[in-house]
């Protein structure tokens, strides 16, 4: 699972 943090304060997580 990869989690990406964006400056917007939202966190997106998706599995590769």
From Swiss-Prot:
Principal cellular location given in the protein's record: secreted
GO cellular component: extracellular region
Residues making up the signal peptide according to the UniProt record: none
Domain of life of the source: Eukaryota
Residues carrying Pyrrolidone carboxylic acid: 1
Residues bearing PTM Leucine amide: 16
The record's account of how the chain is modified after translation: Position 16 could be leucine amide or isoleucine amide.
Cellular localisation: Secreted
Entry keyword Transport: no
Keyword Secreted: yes
UniProt KW keywords: Amidation, Neuropeptide, Pyrrolidone carboxylic acid, Secreted
GO biological process: neuropeptide signaling pathway
Similarity comment: family membership: Belongs to the allatostatin family.
Protein's job: May act as a neurotransmitter or neuromodulator.
Full protein name: Allatostatin-3
Organism whose genome encodes this protein: Rhodnius prolixus (Triatomid bug)
